[in-house]
From Swiss-Prot:
Family per record: Belongs to the IL-6 superfamily.
Keywords: Acute phase, Cytokine, Disulfide bond, Growth factor, Phosphoprotein, Secreted, Signal
Alphabetical list of SUPFAM superfamilies matching this protein: 4-helical cytokines (SSF47266)
Name the UniProt record assigns to this protein: Interleukin-6
Amino acid sequence: MNSLSTSAFSLGLLLVMATAFPTPGPLAGDSKDDATSNSLPLTSANKVEELIKYILGKISALRKEMCDKFNKCEDSKEALAENNLHLPKLEGKDGCFQSGFNQETCLTRITTGLVEFQLHLNILQNNYEGDKENVKSVHMSTKILVQMLKSKVKNQDEVTTPDPTTDASLQAILQSQDECVKHTTIHLILRSLEDFLQFSLRAVRIM
């Protein structure tokens, strides 16, 4: 991807973010508006859905590259790596599933989880040996997705930031001289983010 196409991509994503949510209506005095204010507007939900699909496509390409170029497909060592990384997951208590769905709780958890993944993607971007443009695209798109979703969270203080020690721990793993550990960690991050986004996509569709 040349600099011109990269700039065009960045501009396109920023435009998506800028138009993701319509101008807010009256803050009070309209009971009908109050009744529907908890739901994502149709156009907003569509834009969020399309952005998630875009990110999933890029992740799929990166995972294929990991498999083809580094022979890093499914691996039994991932179970150990997963325990060490504590990557974000969506669980029943997060209110994102059909049973027990809670939009505010779900939006907060998805946004917080993506903020955590941003940290991993930032470090991954600096250590990935394959298609760095795809990694940059995933990182940038995820950042925009966070902003789109966070704007709909009522109590934004509930969106927590990652523990700084996570940064140092992951950095140490990815700078390891053990290529197998490094590639397994990258593969796991991509796979976990893919799973997280797939569950998020289902949740967005019922908001």
